[in-house]
Amino acid sequence: MLGRNFPYFNSVGGFYSRENSRRQPGTGYTSKVRVRDKYHIVGFISSGTYGRVYKAVGRNGQGGEFAIKKFKPDKEGDIIQYTGLSQSAIREMALCSELDHANVVQLAEIILEDKCIFMVFEYTEHDLLQIIHHHTQPQRHPIPAAMVRSILFQLLNGLLYLHTNWVLHRDLKPANILVTSSGAIRIGDLGLARLFYKPLNSLFSGDKVVVTIWYRAPELLMGSRHYTPAVDLWAVGCIFAELLSLRPIFKGEEAKMDSKKTVPFQRNQMMKIIDIMGLPHRDNWPGIVHMPEYSQLQSLAMSRAPNHISRTSNLGSWYQNCLKNGGYSVNSSVGTPGDDGFDLLSRLLDYDPTSRITAKEALEHPYFKNGGPISANCFEGFEGKYPHRRITHDDNDIRSGSLPGTKRSGLPDDSLMSRAAKRMKE
């Protein structure tokens, strides 16, 4: 039974209406408004190829804390070329202006000032990468099983909302899963998100590289030109595993594109998956023979000695070792991931995207049905405290910050990540 703290999802896949939506539909562009007139800039959070992110508080009676994402115009050398915004920036603004769900980051407004775009979001104090990192210091101690369950449920709840509205996220990873101080999960950074309802061209033709390498689904690694919301569910499986083990389950090295922008076969990442999940074959993934990189997979299998490549899945032993080393009970009981947790993980990490569990099916899984109510506050019952985001005050001039343009190069955008967390990830 699901807790009453979750009024958003019902058993038939719909969403209960709320008396007070978090904002009016169509929140969007605000003209003739200056950022500093509405917001006091507290300090600098992080930066990337898109621009910079600052923490702010509202002025003139507008309460609350905000994260202001400043997009920079494209630059060529020292000359700024006002050539418009990147596709990713336009998508993020368009989608965030329409989406409204408790488990998706909330956009307050968009401001245009001096040919710069500012996206004003609600402020979130934590993200999953910070939380995972906290549990590795000074020595490893597990994230409580009840917290993992709440995090995963809220994440899937937000993902169901996105998929129901024909939105693929395409960059789910711990750094992009935000957590408020009250323990609410928000899916953030929709810079790579896009609508997938009747696309005019294949999704591959628009963005040849999607999803950070450690969380990239096997169909993407195998060069699939057409993919589905299943790519987001694989990433959720990777995040679930990382919450339990406190380290990425498939930590491969990314092969970079050559000068001709040819997407290479990610051999090392595929091997990391095979080491745990076994070699994919027609029995567990019938469509694999039609994948563009299938010959590369065959070559990879033949290049390794027969006893040096796993033909069957080792996920079960990985999971048991994870529970044992993490201090969880290996038996299925209240407060531990147990057998239900393994079944959900294995269905999220199904090689075949056509049989991989959906967000709706996952929310109805026994892992959530059994074990009592799920709190909408993932910190409920947790006696420890997580450190706040690192905010620097020596670089808080939102008007003068100078960085590259809005265009992404690969997948660098950990927009609300602290500097320390970025260094840890690298």
From Swiss-Prot:
Residues the entry annotates as binding ATP: I45, S46, S47, G48, T49, Y50, G51, R52, V53, K69
Pfam families in the cross-refs: Pkinase
Gene3D superfamilies on file: Phosphorylase Kinase, domain 1 (3.30.200.20), Transferase(Phosphotransferase) domain 1 (1.10.510.10)
Keyword tags: Activator, ATP-binding, Kinase, Magnesium, Metal-binding, Nucleotide-binding, Nucleus, Repressor, Serine/threonine-protein kinase, Transcription, Transcription regulation, Transferase
Catalytic activity, EC: 2.7.11.22, 2.7.11.23
UniProt cross-references to InterPro entries, sorted A to Z: CDK (IPR050108), Kinase-like_dom_sf (IPR011009), Prot_kinase_dom (IPR000719), Ser/Thr_kinase_AS (IPR008271)
Active site: D171 (proton acceptor)
Ranges where the Protein kinase domain occurs: 39-368
Basic and acidic residues biased stretches: 389-398
Subcellular location: Nucleus
GO molecular function ontology, one term from the record: metal ion binding
Region (Disordered): 389-426
Catalytic activity: L-seryl-[protein] + ATP = O-phospho-L-seryl-[protein] + ADP + H(+); L-threonyl-[protein] + ATP = O-phospho-L-threonyl-[protein] + ADP + H(+); [DNA-directed RNA polymerase] + ATP = phospho-[DNA-directed RNA polymerase] + ADP + H(+)
Major localization class: nucleus
Cofactor needs: Mg(2+)
This protein's GO CC annotations: mediator complex; nucleus
Function as written in the Swiss-Prot or TrEMBL entry: Component of the srb8-11 complex. The srb8-11 complex is a regulatory module of the Mediator complex which is itself involved in regulation of basal and activated RNA polymerase II-dependent transcription. The srb8-11 complex may be involved in the transcriptional repression of a subset of genes regulated by Mediator. It may inhibit the association of the Mediator complex with RNA polymerase II to form the holoenzyme complex. The srb8-11 complex phosphorylates the C-terminal domain (CTD) of the largest subunit of RNA polymerase II.
Subunit structure as annotated in this protein's UniProt entry: Component of the srb8-11 complex, a regulatory module of the Mediator complex.
Protein family: Belongs to the protein kinase superfamily. CMGC Ser/Thr protein kinase family. CDC2/CDKX subfamily.
Name by which UniProt lists this protein: Serine/threonine-protein kinase ssn3
Organism: Emericella nidulans (strain FGSC A4 / ATCC 38163 / CBS 112.46 / NRRL 194 / M139) (Aspergillus nidulans)
Upper lineage: Eukaryota, Fungi, Dikarya, Ascomycota, Pezizomycotina
